[in-house]
Amino acid sequence: MAKSKKIVFTGGGTVGHVTLNLILIPKFLKDGWEVHYIGDKHGVEHEQIDKSGLDVTFHSIATGKLRRYFSWQNMLDVFKVGWGILQSIAIIAKIRPQALFSKGGFVSVPPVIASKLLRVPVYVHESDLSMGLANKIAYKFATTMFTTFEQSKTLVKTRHVGAITKVGMTRFDNSDQLDKIKEQFDEKLKTVLFIGGSAGAKVFNDFISKTPELIENYNIINISGDSSLNTLERHLYRVDYVTDLYQPLMDMADLVVTRGGSNTIFELLAMKKLHLIVPLGKEASRGDQLENADYFERKGYARQLQEPELSWETLKHELEQLVEHAETYKEAMAKSEEITSPDDFYNLLVTSISNK
């Protein structure tokens, strides 16, 4: 009997650290792989895996937050990370997988270190222009780190593959689910979609609630992350979370206002959507979204607006600039070669694993 192929995934803390895993896992399952996931049972990764219904065995470990600054909590978290490494060693030694694939986040560090100690090949994916602290640690233990952006040639274990996204690869017909929304929208107005992400939605939610000029001048779609805001009324659709409707809503939008998370902005690039990036600042993040926004603006894919400057007047100006120069932005996006299909990346990953 042929030896069963096994792979372990890890990554979590935010939806962005799980999305690529959820794209890849069905492909491994389809090809007969046994799939395991190491994460935190209280984290978004467990919620997303559970919600997906995929045939994945989930293993929960202790996890501690990694901080760049002094905190007494660091002392406790050192023990949590150490315990997480021991748990991961026991889990991975029992599974004996062909590889571990990590999408980053604090929870990924123990499984990455454990895999290296057990001589299991470690493949890591980095979405942002600069590495987060977890992936800086993971790089030291990685066999290969795949990157969305070009990295310094001194990082010899990196391999630039571009952004991996399934959004934009297929087109959707108008769904019946959209009919009720369209009935409330004015076809003479531009439709603006606000996407806040799992960590940055509140500012957009509050802004929409406090800015009546928005629904007087635009049709507004707000993916809010907050079910208490769900509503469908004249010129306004607010929903906490979407799956099948995600791309149809993107298709529906003329303009998108988004945070600077790598997954979302590359989805918008794939769909060639006019978009304004309002990145999380350094007070709320490590500055990765600022770097991503600068890169997209420099390449001519998008405009950006800093959060402290967000007002009805500034937003209106930025959206008008996108519309006025729409052809220039769309031409730049059309010329980009920064998108990799999930199938191509899956084949590359499987080949890399097979060659080890």
Curated annotation (Swiss-Prot):
Keyword Cell wall biogenesis/degradation among record annotations: yes
EC number: 2.4.1.227
Gene Ontology BP terms: carbohydrate metabolic process; cell division; cell wall organization; lipid glycosylation; peptidoglycan biosynthetic process; regulation of cell shape
Keywords of the record: Cell cycle, Cell division, Cell membrane, Cell shape, Cell wall biogenesis/degradation, Glycosyltransferase, Membrane, Peptidoglycan synthesis, Transferase
Record-linked SUPFAM superfamilies: UDP-Glycosyltransferase/glycogen phosphorylase (SSF53756)
Keyword Magnesium annotated: no
Pfam families per the UniProt record, alphabetical: Glyco_tran_28_C, Glyco_transf_28
Gene3D superfamilies: Glycogen Phosphorylase B (3.40.50.2000)
Membrane-crossing segments per the record: none
Chain's role: Cell wall formation. Catalyzes the transfer of a GlcNAc subunit on undecaprenyl-pyrophosphoryl-MurNAc-pentapeptide (lipid intermediate I) to form undecaprenyl-pyrophosphoryl-MurNAc-(pentapeptide)GlcNAc (lipid intermediate II).
Family statement drawn from the similarity comment of this UniProt entry: Belongs to the glycosyltransferase 28 family. MurG subfamily.
Protein name: UDP-N-acetylglucosamine--N-acetylmuramyl-(pentapeptide) pyrophosphoryl-undecaprenol N-acetylglucosamine transferase
Native source species: Streptococcus thermophilus (strain ATCC BAA-250 / LMG 18311)
Protein's gene: murG
